[in-house]
A protein has these predicted regions:
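Helix-start (N-cap) detector for alpha-helical repeat units in TPR-like alpha-solenoids
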Residues: 3, 34-35, 67-68
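Alpha-helical linker/edge segments of TPR/alpha-solenoid repeat scaffolds
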Residues: 12, 77-90
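Short coil turns that delineate tetratricopeptide repeat
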Residues: 31, 64-65
Length: 90
């Protein structure tokens, strides 16, 4: 399965939880896919699992420093800083 196949499969998925399961299975087979970690992080964020989302963004950045996870991580930090400064302390 390619990352494009994964994206196509996710188009028919309605819940974040189901998407997380599918992406996690993909990551198990492709542990170096920064894009998959970024996608799962976004689904975790949507499901309310902020710390898991941040961990996935950081993993994606470790795999590929040029990853778009930088944008997701920055947006997450800004949201957390705005909503509750005690929740995230760099």
């Amino acid at each position: 399965m390619t990352i494009e196949d994964l994206k196509s499969e996710l188009k028919s998925v309605l819940s974040n939880e189901e998407a997380i399961e599918i992406i996690s299975a993909y990551i198990a087979e492709h542990p170096d896919s920064d894009e998959a970690y970024t996608m799962r992080g976004m689904k975790y964020w949507g499901a309310g699992s902020r710390s898991l989302a941040l961990n996935d963004y950081l993993t994606a950045i470790r795999i590929n420093p040029e990853s778009r996870a930088h944008l997701a991580l920055q947006a997450s930090k800004e949201i957390l800083d705005y909503r509750n400064k005690d929740l995230y302390n760099p």
